[in-house]
Amino acid sequence: MNRRDLLKTGIAALPLISVATAQEIAAKSKGLPPLTIKDVKVITTNGGSHYRWIFLKVITSEPGLYGIGSANNNYETMAVVAALEEHLKPWLIGKDPDRIEDLWQSAQMRTYWRNGPVNNNVLSAMDMALWDIKGKRANMPVYDLLGGKARDGVPVYDHQGGKTKEECLDALQKSVANGFTHVRIQLGGYGGGGFTPQGEGGRPEGGYQGPAFDEEQYVDAIPPLFEFLRDKAGFGPKLIHDVHSHLSGMNAVELARRLQPCQMFYVEDILPPEELAYYRNIREICTTPQAVGEVFSHPLEVVPLVKDRLIDFIRCRVVATGGITPIKKLTTLCEIFGVRTAFQEGGENDPINQIASYHVDISSTAFGIQEENHFPPIVHEMFPGIGEIRRGYLYGSGKPGLGIDIDEALAAKNPLGPIKDGGAYGTDRTIDGAVVKP
């Protein structure tokens, strides 16, 4: 072969080499292989206690790869279970789990009516499971996919209370000794200090005889409690109080005004969601920080309060607002307007919802505080990788995805019990028998 033939052969081969190389590079740069959702499983359990927990397991076409999400709703449990099994499951199977945003949007629109709590619970379970899958595929915790850690641990506030001021002081000091810097204090239960005892007071003939809530009595009782705590414990502990939406407009304004000298970290749910306009009145008269959002399920409940800076903390529950995808967007909105997060994770909340909040909180500069939840030992056994609270901080496992799993066999041994009164939330009443908003 002469020089000219050699050159011709070489030149002719160049495109072939380039194409082969390009194909090899393209194959290597495609990343992970495509996935589909192969099956969807609904898991329910009482958590070995009084809980009514609902979880979703999204199983992919890759052997051993699945995600877990929470659909927790203690009060309409079976409605959520039916929505997951009968409506979401057949719609979700066969879809691409990598398309989290598209699946969230289309899952919301598939019901036509949207933003209700049951539908949001369904969205949340799917969304958390998809983020769990995404993190496991990337071999990264979800918080790394959200931008990485913005802090080393997530501070949580402790729950305390007592029947008297002295009992409340003892409880506060116990929390501080255990490393908590933020403590929520209640005088008895929700509305405590504002109840007329059973059968006492002027009541309608043949009417309601149970403990009766009185707004003015409550407004008179709570400020002296926190004045006492500040006098005895000083201004070091960051104090929180939950009104639990028991007050109407001007009584809420008056309580906020009276609590200003106590320098509260915040007052929680001082107004019911039907009377949010009164937050403007509170802002105009005092600087007592306000937190709200526990029962919110629609973004338009949140946006006006945040953009007008009428509140200081947003207290949405991740599982009630649709999951990690929408709550991360809400957190970004709050950051722009200087509002902080205080996600609601106590009470009947579950470990998966708690750890989903953790991933958002640890990666956000809008974070303020997270509510604690102490689970019994059986729950720690049932949920490998459960979050751990130590000295006032919540820590995740650091494993890929959400970093938490569920022991399905143990969950099955602790099934949901009978539903009392249809799962209804308890109702407080006034002395004349009228319903008090929770």
Language-model features, listed with the residues they occupy:
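Extended hydrophobic packing segments that form well-structured cores
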Residues: 402-438
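Metal- or metallocofactor-binding catalytic centers and their adjacent structured scaffolds
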Residues: 61-62, 66-137, 435
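N-terminal export signals
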Residues: 3-24
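Short beta-strand elements
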Residues: 54-62, 387
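Shared catalytic-loop signature of beta/alpha-barrel
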Residues: 86, 102, 257-266, 272-401
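Conserved, mostly hydrophobic/aromatic
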Residues: 37, 64, 88, 126, ...
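Metal-dependent enolase-superfamily TIM-barrel catalytic cores that perform enediolate-based chemistry
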Residues: 153-280
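C-terminal segment of N-terminal export signals and the immediately downstream linker at the start
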Residues: 18-49, 66
